């Protein structure tokens, strides 16, 4: 009960946790597990970055199973473009789904052709390496719509996957999702 275990969160990833862990080691001369979210080179978990996004999809698959279906061929709206959204999208693709949207705090992209593995790699590089904005995706790929200052919940799809921050879907958003045929939100 008296133990504090610092961890990554919005804007704090493995790099930042690694900095804190390095300073802890320097000051305490210990290499014990006092931080969660550190890189593997510091004793972190194998798939820590993927865990939340993958877990979201595993939960979704269980929900879909109760309806006698799975993700194959289903269209998905994803909000966010950070760690959780990236790995949510990756697992959707692995399970045969089609990702139509991703977003950031400025707006969202809608790609009717779908965000495939190559396009997702572009987003991961854009966001993780260059700290770019999602609108740059629309500038890179023809036929993509960028909607400034909005969330993707007004688009038609089978599934909605809020993966940005908390309190993403309000009552009006829920009505839009239902009206547009969304069968599951995870």
Spans of model-derived segments:
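Short acidic (Asp/Glu) and glycine-rich catalytic loops that position anionic groups and cofactors
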Residues: 1, 36, 103, 178-179
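N-terminal ligand-binding/catalytic initiation module
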Residues: 1-46
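Structural motif
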Residues: 3-5, 32, 75-76, 97-101, ...
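Glycine- and other small-residue-rich loops at beta-strand/loop junctions that grip anionic moieties
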Residues: 9, 45, 49, 77, ...
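Conserved helix-loop functional segments at active or binding sites
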Residues: 26, 61-66, 166, 175
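Glycine-rich phosphate/diphosphate-binding loop of Rossmann-like nucleotide-binding domains
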Residues: 39, 43-151
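Mobile, glycine- and charge-enriched loop segments
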Residues: 149-151, 156-159
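ADP-ribose/adenylate-binding Rossmann-like module
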Residues: 157-186
């Amino acid at each position: 009960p008296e133990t504090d275990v610092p961890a990554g969160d919005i804007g704090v990833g493995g790099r930042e946790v690694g900095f804190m862990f390095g300073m802890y080691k320097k000051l305490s001369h210990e290499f014990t597990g006092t931080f969660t979210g550190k890189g593997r080179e510091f004793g972190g978990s194998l798939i820590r970055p993927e865990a939340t996004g993958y877990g979201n999809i595993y939960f979704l698959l269980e929900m879909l199973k109760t309806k006698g279906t799975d993700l194959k061929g289903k269209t998905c709206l994803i909000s966010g473009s950070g760690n959780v959204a990236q790995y949510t999208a990756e697992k959707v693709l692995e399970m045969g789904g089609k990702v139509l949207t991703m977003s950031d705090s400025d707006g969202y992209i809608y790609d009717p052709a779908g965000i495939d593995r190559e396009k997702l790699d572009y987003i991961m590089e854009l966001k993780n390496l260059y700290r770019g904005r999602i609108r740059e995706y629309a500038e890179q790929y023809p036929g993509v719509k960028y909607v400034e200052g909005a969330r993707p919940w007004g688009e038609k799809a089978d599934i909605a996957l809020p993966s940005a921050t908390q309190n993403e879907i309000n009552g009006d958003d829920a009505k839009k999702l239902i009206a547009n045929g969304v069968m599951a939100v995870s």
